[in-house]
Amino acid sequence: NPTKKKRFNADTIEELKRKESGSSEDIIEMHIKNSKDSMLTVAELAKITALSLDEVKQDVDALEEKGIIKVFHMKKDSYTWHRDNGKMLQEEMIKTLQIYHEKHLYRYGMQKAEIHMTFMRKVKPNVFDLYMESLVGEGVMKRRNEFLSLPQHEIVKDRIYQQVESKLLTTFEKAGLDFPKVSEIDFGTVPFEVVEDILLLLMEEKKIIKLGEELYTLTSYIEKSRDYLFYVKRKRFDYHGGNSRCFGNKQEER
């Protein structure tokens, strides 16, 4: 059944005017534009407008070709998004990311899931991913793993960064296999949140490895330990294997 419309509703009046003009394409565009926090599917548009799926698909294709909307194709349906809504959303995301980058100097960006829940929670995650990929392709966003940032954002390894990095690497190097807790290391006036951010970056760069809750060490130590264990295991294998061959030879001689 068609959605019940309130009298004098602005969107309803606009729809009636467009219906009078006889342009189904205009009506489709209007509904897509009015859906500012979600993406209407072709099936939903057909239900709203009482048009056939084929008619809606034709209008959607025409709107996409004109650059008025974006269409994200999934297996079961196609999702539509108006360029005007996209511009407004991009402006909001850019402002949010600018503030975020200023506050968190040592992070690659906001987590993709956080941006999804903040701006487009009504959009399915896989459709949201397609939209973010399109923004990355257009140079609006930059992505690194599960982090999204502004294209120009780069982590500056300034004095504070170098101070924390040096403290962490030196402490873990001296500790060997004692695995000191990061929370027990003295970083002076540097906030612990900043220390955690730099620690995550060092893990990303494979300089430090996490072993457990608050347990970290140098990646080089783990690699050396792994090489040593492999060496010992190989020596034991060669020793026992050699003895077996010797015993086998003696038995053969008998």
Where are the regions that the model predicts?
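C-terminal effector modules of nucleic-acid-centric enzymes and ribosome-associated factors
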Residues: 1-210, 218-254
